């Protein structure tokens, strides 16, 4: 029987230069795999907890304690186990932690091991990770949401909304969709430069200039799509991530960049106006995570017209998603493995969403690495969409390049952008 022979974690840096956990699992047959845990900037209050060291080292953001938990407590429990029983391995770590939010061992410790075990098991069986986790039915290449203009917590500018994204929905295969997206991205840069805008990049590779309001970035994206030779609304559509919890204060939505303070109803009306004017097909976190009444208003007004994605709202947590299903709010969920903390729990949440006709969007975090686990995971779970930043910066393109590799390897791969909306 093949078993887990060694588990080791060390501290490495993410794309923002902050420490994170890298877990490495070695099996008795010599198979070995590592996984690097991502970290978010705008985080939901109900997310599983990253364990940070505090103190002066790395300005308090060190993860040596989380690594120590892997190398002692977790390793002692899992060494000798079969790597192929992912659910049992994850459950043992959950029991060992014993807290609702994984604050004892740290979600960053637990997830690193969970991912590394899955990858080591796949290597042992000489299977690609997506095939190991998804089986024979893992065939769908996700339609990317490419964050090409950054605002909010992802950029140092006056734009309130956090992400302005393009979705190449009008193409027949992933490679062509990605090519078109890259062309729009580079065309956008030329337009910004021509108008004297700064083209510094935000955390996720998008441009982060100042604009006069929250609508102007959309105008630039439309121009870039057209100048690149594509049709807005047909070949390439637009998605927004408002990350509105970041500007929700005392029951109101404060759009500082526009000097406006809006109620939930007024904010929803603003979104309806934008959707009527531009080819917007998806809005993420349109209202704040604690504003369930606002979410109901948003869903009732726009839920039959566009995709409404819950990120901070659901935090990849099946219990919170179940509440949303029962209340009839949102119609899609963002899937971030580090919000919940294990591979198995992430898969459970995806299955619950899909059973209830909620779309699933696999997602990176703003603090990423060269680890492309989520590319395989998106295909394994037949998530129809993926968010992993602009087609720039190595940690973002690692995911796109892996998806290109997967697309070439699957006979009969499906790209369903045209059928999403």
Curated annotation (Swiss-Prot):
Catalytic activity: (2R)-2-phosphoglycerate = phosphoenolpyruvate + H2O
Keyword Metal-binding: yes
Active site per database record: 204 (proton donor), 336 (proton acceptor)
Gene Ontology process terms (BP): glycolytic process
Cofactor binding, note field: Binds a second Mg(2+) ion via substrate during catalysis.
Residue numbers binding (2R)-2-phosphoglycerate: 162, 336, 365-366, 387
Keyword Metal-binding on entry: yes
Cofactor(s) needed by this chain: Mg(2+)
Domain of life: Bacteria
Function: Catalyzes the reversible conversion of 2-phosphoglycerate (2-PG) into phosphoenolpyruvate (PEP). It is essential for the degradation of carbohydrates via glycolysis.
Protein family according to the UniProt entry: Belongs to the enolase family.
PANTHER family associated with the record: ENOLASE
Protein name per its UniProtKB record: Enolase
């Amino acid at each position: 029987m093949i078993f887990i022979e060694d588990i080791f974690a060390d501290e490495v840096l993410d794309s923002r230069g902050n420490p994170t956990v890298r877990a490495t699992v070695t099996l008795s047959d010599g198979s070995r795999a590592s996984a690097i845990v991502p970290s978010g900037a705008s985080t939901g209050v109900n997310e599983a907890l990253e364990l940070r060291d505090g103190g002066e080292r790395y300005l308090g953001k060190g993860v040596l304690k989380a690594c120590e938990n892997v190398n002692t407590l977790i390793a002692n429990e899992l060494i000798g186990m079969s790597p192929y029983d992912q659910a049992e391995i994850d459950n043992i770590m959950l029991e060992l932690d014993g807290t609702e939010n994984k604050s004892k061992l740290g979600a960053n410790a637990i997830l690193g091991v969970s991912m590394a075990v899955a990858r080591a098991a796949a290597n042992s069986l000489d299977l690609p990770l997506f095939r190991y986790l998804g089986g024979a039915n893992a065939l769908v290449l996700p339609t990317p949401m490419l964050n090409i203009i950054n605002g909010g917590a992802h950029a140092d500018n006056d734009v309130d909304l956090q992400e302005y994204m393009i979705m190449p929905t009008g193409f027949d295969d992933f490679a062509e969709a990605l090519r078109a997206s890259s062309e729009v991205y580079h065309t956008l840069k030329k337009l910004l430069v021509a108008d004297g805008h700064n083209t510094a990049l935000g955390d996720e590779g998008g441009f982060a200039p100042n604009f006069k309001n929250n609508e102007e970035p959309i105008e630039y994206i439309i121009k870039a799509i057209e100048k690149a030779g594509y049709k807005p609304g047909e070949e390439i559509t637009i998605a927004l991530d408002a990350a509105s919890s970041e500007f929700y204060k005392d029951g109101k939505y404060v759009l500082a960049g526009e000097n406006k303070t809006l109620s939930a109803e007024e904010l929803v009306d603003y979104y309806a106006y934008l959707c009527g004017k531009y080819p917007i097909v998806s809005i993420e976190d349109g209202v704040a995570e604690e504003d369930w009444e606002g979410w109901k208003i948003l869903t009732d007004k726009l839920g039959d017209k566009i995709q409404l994605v819950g990120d901070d709202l659901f935090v990849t947590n099946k219990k919170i998603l179940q509440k949303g299903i029962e209340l009839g709010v949102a119609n899609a969920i963002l899937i971030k493995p580090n919000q919940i903390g294990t591979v198995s729990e992430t898969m459970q949440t995806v299955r619950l969403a899909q059973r209830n006709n909620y779309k699933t969007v696999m997602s990176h975090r703003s603090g990423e690495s060269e680890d492309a686990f989520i590319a395989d995971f998106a295909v394994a779970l037949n998530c129809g969409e993926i968010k992993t930043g602009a087609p720039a910066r190595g940690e973002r393109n690692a995911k796109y390049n892996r998806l290109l590799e997967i697309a070439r390897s699957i006979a009969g791969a499906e790209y369903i952008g045209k059928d999403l909306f």
